[in-house]
Each structure stands twice: as C-alpha cells, then as structure tokens.
Amino acid sequence: MKPLVSIVILSYNQLKVSCEFLDSCRALSYDNYEIIMVDNASAEDPTQLIKTNYPYVRFIRNEQNLGFAGGNNIGIAAAKGDYIFIVNNDTEVTPDLLDKLLEPFQKDPAIGVVSPKIKYFSNPTLIQYAGYTAMNPFTGQAVAIGHKQEDQGQHDKSGYTNFAHGAAMMVKKEVIEKVGAMPDIFFLYYEELDWAEQIKRAGFKIYYQAEGEIFHKESVSVGKESPLKAYYHTRNRVLFMRRNTSPFQFTLFSLFLVTCVIPKGLLKYILKRQPIHLKNFIRGLWWNVGYRTAKPGHPSPSMQAALR
C-alpha cells in the first residue's frame, strides 16, 4: 500500500493564493494524500468558503497568528500521514511532485527530509532553490544553490544537501517523533534552518530532489522588504547562531555582526528613508540582548566542519 502523505499548508490573509494552491493539487498523480489547511487568524474568516469549495480539506482556524512554525506545528499535530509535506500556500505543485519527493526515502532510510527544485512562479525558468550551501559560521547565512539562475540543467543532479527549503519540504514522520516539531520561538524565518540542524544532530540526512519541481510566488504573505521581515530576519539570524554554534564561534560571529551587519543595516534603511524598517532592525537586535535563555548549543557536524 502506498504511504499516506499529509500535505500541510499555512494560510494568512491570502485566501485567493491558498485556493490557487488547492486547485493545483487536483492534478497530483499520487492519490494517497490528505490536505490539512491551517489558517493563522486571517482577518477574513475563510472557513465557509474552504468547506464549501474544498470539502476534502481538513481545515483548522487558529484564534491567533502563531507564526510560520507555530501554525505549521498545528497542522503537523493533526497529520495522519507517514510523510508530512510542509508547503507554502503561495506555491503551485507539479503533477508528479509527491511521487518524486517520496523516491529518495525508499533509497536511503537515513534520509529524513526532502525538498524539490523550487522555481519562481512569475519566471518559471528561474531557480530559487536547488539545495543549500553550508551555513557560513562567521556570517550566519546559508546560500540557496542556483538562486536566480536560469535553469539550463546545471542543477539537475539530486543529492544530499545542508538544508531543506521551508517553502516545500517533505519530512518523514519518524523524524518528527524523534526530534519534535518546528521550533516556534522563531515565529518567522530561520525556523526550518534551526530544525534542520536538530534533524542532522539526530542522525538524519537532508536531500535535494532535482526531479521534483514546484513554483513559488515568493513573499506574497509578508512582502520582499516588509518591516516584519526586517525584524524577524535580523532577530532570528542571531538567535540561530546562539542555538547552533559554540561560544567561541558565536564570539567571532558577534564581531562580524558589530563591524559589518549592523553598520550596513543602519545605513541601508537610513538611505532608503525607511524609519519603520530601521526601528524593526534595531528591535530585532535588541531582542537578543534581553532574551537570555537561548544559549548557544552544540554545533552540528556540518557547522563543525565549516569551522576547520
């Protein structure tokens, strides 16, 4: 019998986009799946519309916005599948996507997470993700391989990678049972990267499946340069490093933060005349000064290797 796949999507104030995703799922060739849609307290209650037009969807409406990790965790908890496909609502799937994502799990039991090749919906030949580089232990950033490159087959080789992409990642249920759900302390940004570090420390591998494709309408929910992003991306970059590096390495990162990241961020928002962005950038930094419990953890093997 085919394993059950639970498709978990999170929606927030983007009902039209969510419906477009659900419509794209009608063409899926894999037939043993369920869809769980979690609404993160959108201003417009979509309950009746979803239940009327998509009666097969298991719909959950949160009373408050729990963020990316918290909202998805609600869906993960409700999932019955052997595999959980966590996918952004601002994507559209290709017919054989689930089939392709399942294949690597059958070949290597150590694989815990699989992400497909991700392309931009607005420019279908342009790649957003074809795997990830290792996290730079000094800058606190990882780079999506193939980002904004024309797809000419140069990233058609599947293989192990450092991180899955939060917009589309299939996770084996065994992984969640062993590691736990996504760390909701992040709320938005870096949560899947932190989760990946936990997953790797537990002995699982992360895999990039080049044969599976999905199209992403990037940043429909929060905007490419939103004040929300300025806050959480800044805050969580520091938080990630606190949780996943040694004290010595975090000290080196802090020097980079003070000498490069902070001056560059301040200058950028001042020159762009974006006072709200500037305020949120500073708030994101200051949050880490006041929040004391997220002590640096033990570096994963990949982070240790990057330090050598």
Task: Identify the role of each PLM range.
Residues P3-S6, E34, D194:
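Cell-envelope/extracellular polymer assembly enzymes that use nucleotide-activated donors
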Residues F21, R61-A79, N89-T91:
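Glycine-rich, basic loop-to-helix element that forms the pyrophosphate-binding segment
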Residues D23-N32:
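Short, acidic, metal-binding catalytic loop of nucleotide-sugar glycosyltransferases
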Residues E44-T52:
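Acidic helix N-cap motif at the loop->helix transition within catalytic regions
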Residues I84:
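Short aromatic/hydrophobic "clamp" motif used to bind/position activated sugar donors
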Residues E92-Y129, M135-P137:
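Conserved donor NDP-sugar-binding/catalytic core segment of glycosyltransferases
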Residues N162-E213:
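A short, conserved alpha-helix in the catalytic core of glycosyltransferases
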Residues L228-N236, P247-R308:
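Non-catalytic, C-terminal membrane-associated alpha-helical segments of glycosyltransferases
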